[in-house]
């Protein structure tokens, strides 16, 4: 996925995340495609937490984006499990209607306690995995 923004191109690299999480004692497969931003500054120092972006990710937290806010993981099809994209919080807010208009009101997976917990567990695991990919050079 790529889009042009003035003379700068933002490129998202598609990767296959393979993994499982435990939800209420049951193992769930949370493998999916994730479109990763390639412009995250992993050395950025977050004064609030005292951690670099890479250290935040190693702790299961999202890195801070160029807008000064944590990077969001957006469900492209609004389904858990489903493909995701890393986007800036400001983009997530600015295009909220367009990004979330694919499902009816009240139909969000977040209304299902098991799926919501599954996603929250995935999110923490994903950022740790993403940090390992950076450290390992993959």
Show which residues each predicted segment covers.
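Catalytic toxin/effector domains delivered as secreted proteins or via bacterial secretion systems
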Residues: 3-138
């Amino acid at each position: 996925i790529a889009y042009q923004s003035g003379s700068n191109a933002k490129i998202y690299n598609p990767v296959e995340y393979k993994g499982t999480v435990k939800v209420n004692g049951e193992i769930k497969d949370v493998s999916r495609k994730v479109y990763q931003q390639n412009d995250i500054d992993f050395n950025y120092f977050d004064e609030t937490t005292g951690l670099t972006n890479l250290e935040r990710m190693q702790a299961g937290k999202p890195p801070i984006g160029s807008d000064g806010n944590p990077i969001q993981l957006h469900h492209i099809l609004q389904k858990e499990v489903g493909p995701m994209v890393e986007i800036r919080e400001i983009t997530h807010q600015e295009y909220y209607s367009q990004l979330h208009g694919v499902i009816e009101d009240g139909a969000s997976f977040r209304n299902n306690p098991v799926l919501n917990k599954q996603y929250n567990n995935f999110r923490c695991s994903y950022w740790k995995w993403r940090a390992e990919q950076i450290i390992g050079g993959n």
